A protein has these predicted regions:
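Short, glycine/charge-rich flexible loops or terminal/linker lids adjacent to PRPP-binding catalytic cores
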Residues: 177-224
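Short, flexible loop segments at the rims of nucleotide/cofactor-binding pockets, characterized by
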Residues: 135-137, 200-204, 229
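A cytosolic small-molecule/anion-sensing beta-strand core signal
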Residues: 46, 219, 227
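Flexible loop/turn segments at secondary-structure boundaries
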Residues: 51, 59-61, 80-82, 105-106, ...
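Short, contiguous acidic/charged loop-to-helix segments that flank catalytic cores in large enzymes
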Residues: 135, 213-214, 226-231
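Amphipathic alpha-helical
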Residues: 13-23, 162, 174-192
Length: 233
């Protein structure tokens, strides 16, 4: 669920209020997971350790990492791999654990209903991330391969809409034998995700300013462009 924008209450305050409805932290976390109509995963820092809970349907990941005398939890494992941590495991749907620097203990066992968000692989996930043992980059590459097997088109080059469309395009190009090219490059320092604004004119402006054409790779060419998804029609 989204943080409320009127400044009166936000999602963290709301979840904390739900947890406080019960007599102890574990019952409170379970109550919050059951009450919220949607996905809710959380980390709670306490004096005895960090409590981690994954939403009851497993839509959003929680992964655990470890190294000597240290443990961590986050949304994607790539965030800690360069810090010397290694993967421990992913929490299951509705699972609650508590961990400190030395150990991790399961407080509520995972459920058996997994409905992870497939958009993690298609768009949201960082290329080096994996969810439930499936690599984001490899999945996107394989999607491109399958598209190439289905198609029969006469084009000069294959290109992806950066960034998350790039792996799809490379898979397509390698499978089809059509050269891969980069006729568009992305400039991101000052422009956010183009699908997020609610006004179409703003979305058009962001897309226009963020994608910079390489005209020498476009002129007189037949291009096949692959994007990862169509969030808005």
């Amino acid at each position: 669920f989204f943080e409320m924008s009127n400044g009166e209450i936000n999602s963290t305050e709301l979840v904390a209020a739900l947890i406080n409805q019960k007599d102890n932290l574990i019952e409170g976390i379970q109550y919050a997971l059951d009450t919220v109509d949607g996905s809710l995963s959380m980390l709670i820092l306490t004096p005895v350790g960090i409590y981690a809970a994954r939403d009851k349907m497993g839509r959003t990941p929680v992964v655990l990492g470890k190294k000597e005398d240290a443990r961590c939890a986050c949304f994607e494992s790539f965030s800690y791999l360069n810090l010397g941590y290694e993967n421990d495991r992913e929490l299951g749907p509705g699972e609650i654990v508590v961990f400190d620097e030395k150990s991790c203990r399961t407080l509520v066992a995972p459920g058996d209903k997994m409905k992870i968000c497939t958009f993690l692989w298609v768009y949201y996930g960082y290329p080096s991330a994996s969810y439930e043992g499936v690599s984001v980059e490899k999945m996107r590459y394989n999607c491109g391969k399958l598209l190439a097997r289905r198609d029969n088109v006469d084009v000069d080059v294959v290109a992806g809409v950066p960034d998350s469309g790039t792996a799809h395009a490379i898979g397509y190009a390698n499978e089809s034998g059509i050269p891969f090219s980069r006729p568009f490059v992305k400039y991101t320092p000052t422009w956010p995700r183009s699908f997020m604004p609610t006004i179409q004119q703003k979305r058009d402006l962001i897309a226009h300013m963020k994608l910079i054409p390489v005209h020498d790779l476009i002129k007189d060419k037949k291009l096949l462009l692959i994007d990862d998804s169509i969030v808005r029609g």
